[in-house]
């Protein structure tokens, strides 16, 4: 390892927390914002396909559970392995960190092949289960048929990018996402409109973009500039290391995989009470929610290597400072977006559709659904901090609590207590937000105080 690389890694434990958090979080936030373009740009263009944009947009929304599940499996291994590698670096165990990287890479690729085969075989019944109607199923299948062929590229770019951030190279990690998202933005109109491929064109553009992102990640992790190098000798599944990574990655996996269950619950209930138009509105609401969630995740990812390194080095004062700054920045951002959405909902919705009937229904739903959206700052900030500290069990519980224990039951139960069934379905979101934020904040403050006191 070069002297410069040693200095870059050591900075995680010595540089002033404020400037370091800004330096690491800005690229990861930028990466998440740009990553948002992958899905949002597709939706914006698809929603404007002549004559069929409304149904095509709704059909694409039905594919979200599959797309989310692929990302969740990447997180299971990648977001579990990267903090483990960062903790190993903090403890000066560089060889162990590289073995973690090799194990996670082998596992990601094996899992990608399995998922590709399963989704190709069972996509039609799955999409019907997820809320597709006879009108929207053809559009959903057109997109998903091609998208799943790029599963290995998604697993590589999403699953391994955290290992770049884990060594303090968040600017390189940012480029992984920027390269793919910019390319996707450029290719979408070409394939959708110029080549007249419609929904299929959006899928092709996404696959090409993800392949380029994956190539960028592999080029860096096998090159000379990396502290954690992907070595052929370590390219095998070490079961104890994989179990350790999966144990920690279970929380982000549950966070994302339960998003699939959540989408199914929403889609099925909305299809029952409002038809395709209500499902189409939910597609837009999901996009707006991602505008808040993904940057918050990027901020937490920027803070993770600093917090993990400080934990490994047993620096409680530094750990407290990281958590304080992370939470303050998260709240300011989340509150700002919440205010903008509540004040200018028509402007936000018009980004995705020009269909006035869909616009009006979505604006009404958005104000209800996003009523307490700013509480995501507490949920994401504290839950991801538990991941950085290696607290797998608590993080997993918090990941399950909001969606599985609160939100999904509320989606199914609340309509029985309201005359306006659609209102009740959308109301489930802010009710769950309030309860989850209170629980997450309380648990983190209690456990974090204990961890730092015992050091």
What are the roles of these predicted feature ranges?
Residues 23-42, 146, 180, 209-213, ...:
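Transmembrane helical elements of multi-pass membrane transporters/channels
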Residues 33, 37-58, 127-134, 190-197, ...:
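Helix-terminus/linker motif at the lipid-water interface of multi-pass membrane proteins
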Residues 147-165, 176-181, 202-215, 297-300, ...:
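Short runs within selected transmembrane alpha-helices of multi-pass transporters and secretion channels
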Residues 31, 35, 39-46, 71-78, ...:
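Alpha-helical transmembrane segments and their lipid-water interface positions
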Residues 57-117, 154-173, 279-339, 343-345, ...:
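Small-residue-rich hydrophobic transmembrane alpha-helices
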Residues 1-28, 85-152, 194-250, 307-372, ...:
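Short alpha-helical transmembrane segments in multi-pass integral membrane proteins
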Residues 18-37, 41, 66-73, 110, ...:
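Residue-level signal for short hydrophobic patches within transmembrane helices
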Residues 54-65, 140-144, 203, 276-291, ...:
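Small-residue hotspots at the loop-to-helix junctions and early N-terminal turns
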